[in-house]
């Protein structure tokens, strides 16, 4: 089993704080995280590909779906005693504050993990209960103030005794600095490696893995259209290099042709390779609110992301039944109004 997070002491000596910082005596984790420049602090970036910051979106409904699927998949893969290599091609900062400026500016976590935790489901589906327990392990009792990103989720579930490995890639200049610092506090040693490299390209050198077992999470920001074609090209190349790996692709369901074409393309690639696949989507729908009057010159109201999907190639045979039980409960709690729904299909 991976590192067991202690929300009081796990970040003792965080490198972003001075060594004599008072919080180091008994620091709540949420008080010592350093996640880079705040909005308006002058820490801007000159390249468009670096405009996306996941800290604004951490813990939203898309993260809930992604990590629900990720945890359920890892639980199955780690039942075998043989080593596993896990890869996150777009790792982000690793862990996020839900009470920080970025999360509070967007408010997206309120309609995701915060709402789900507050719902207090009497009989949550096993996969949903497992997900909530993983998030809770990084927090004090009550409302979550920290949200573990995929690197923290994966590392927590990997096993030191089995010599599982985790490879993390991130290109954002601020997020990679935060990621290195955050992962160092887990004291995972050689189990985890972090690199400021293009995850799409770097994955090629890792396949096939010496362990002969791999889980690969691919979740770029999709802020540029080429990300969609890069994802499908990455899957096509990866299946040629290592056809038996388990590949998880997250994508946003937005009114863009590339977004709707991506799952169709992934189905085709899986079918051509003769591999099974699973496709899950969650749409929380539009808010049922009275429209607000706009003044002349105001920017049009944008509802934000309301739906996303997870596409899994070579899914565990246990994944579909556990999601079939969990997704309706997710929709029950997180669904907001017109357009809400969930789907689950498989093939191969």
Per-segment meaning from a language model:
Residues 5-8, 29, 46, 66:
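Low-complexity, intrinsically disordered short peptide segments enriched in small/polar/basic residues
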Residues 11, 18-22, 101:
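N-terminal low-complexity, intrinsically disordered patches enriched in charged
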Residues 1-3, 7-17:
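Polybasic, low-complexity intrinsically disordered segments
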Residues 16, 25-28, 32, 41, ...:
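Short, positively charged and aromatic/hydrophobic N-terminal segments
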Residues 44-348:
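Class I S-adenosyl-L-methionine-dependent methyltransferase catalytic core
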